[in-house]
């Protein structure tokens, strides 16, 4: 699974970005990603505009036919955390609401912070864990060894890391995930009971790369 955070988004100074803004096009980053896209992969894309636009940006810079996706799927389950009424609001107003709440060193919110009419990061982690568990079951049943390129969001990728490494959500919020970066996981399905050489040590997910810049191969 190659998780790609979308391009930067259009936003107004002094305001929280809207929930579904357009992506800003960085030609150099899209070109670099186009060069390193795997062959014969399946692309899974969050339905928000910024991820769909990023996938299209990268597609324009693929180097050869084998890099074009075997299939594409829009997946609502990997959508970004919904900030509810905070999306598009003035930053000063949001900070005023957050002032009396518990603080986080590296995020404006704690995992348990409840955005008005929105979704807690802790709840997003549960949502992503459910999605990944479904993928784990499918991979084991189908013996699927295909590569999946996932065009998603910073908090989605943090939630993925939380699930794969059993990190508490507040710790996952401390992980930097940059625009156009790749975070790569391999999944090792458990073998049938009674016929397994695997141990519980290490879990079933291996991190191959974290927050890899688009400029690196």
Roles of regions detected by a PLM:
Residues 17-20, 60-133:
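Phosphate-handling substructures
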Residues 39-77, 100-107, 186-217:
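Conserved histidine-centered catalytic loops in small-molecule metabolism enzymes
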Residues 1-66:
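Active-site-proximal alpha-helix that buttresses catalytic centers in soluble enzyme cores
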Residues 7, 154, 213:
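Active-site metal-binding loops of divalent metal-dependent hydrolases
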Residues 45-46, 126, 151-152:
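Short beta-strand scaffold positions
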Residues 60, 81-93, 141-146, 162-217:
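Acidic, low-complexity terminal tails and accessory targeting/binding regions
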Residues 30-35, 125, 129-140, 161:
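Generic structural signal for well-ordered alpha-helical scaffold segments
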Residues 1, 41, 142-155:
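Generic beta-sheet signal
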């Amino acid at each position: 699974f190659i998780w790609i955070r979308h391009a930067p988004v259009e936003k107004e100074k002094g305001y929280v970005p809207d929930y579904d803004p357009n992506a800003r096009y960085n030609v150099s980053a899209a070109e670099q990603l186009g060069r390193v896209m795997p062959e014969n992969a399946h692309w899974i894309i969050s339905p928000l505009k910024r991820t769909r636009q990023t996938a299209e940006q990268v597609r324009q810079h693929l180097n050869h036919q084998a890099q074009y996706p075997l299939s594409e799927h829009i997946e609502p389950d990997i959508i970004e955390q919904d900030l509810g009424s905070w999306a598009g609001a003035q930053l000063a107003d949001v900070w005023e609401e957050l002032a009396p709440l518990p603080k986080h060193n590296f995020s404006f919110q704690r995992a348990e912070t409840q955005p008005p009419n929105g979704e807690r990061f802790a709840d997003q982690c549960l949502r992503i864990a459910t999605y990944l568990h479904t993928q784990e079951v499918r991979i084991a049943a189908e013996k699927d060894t295909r590569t999946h390129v996932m065009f998603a969001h910073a908090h989605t990728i943090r939630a993925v890391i939380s699930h794969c490494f059993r990190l508490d959500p507040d710790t996952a919020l401390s992980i930097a995930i940059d625009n156009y970066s790749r975070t790569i996981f391999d999944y090792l399905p458990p073998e049938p009971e009674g016929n397994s050489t695997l141990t519980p040590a290490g879990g079933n997910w291996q991190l191959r790369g974290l927050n890899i810049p688009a400029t690196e191969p």
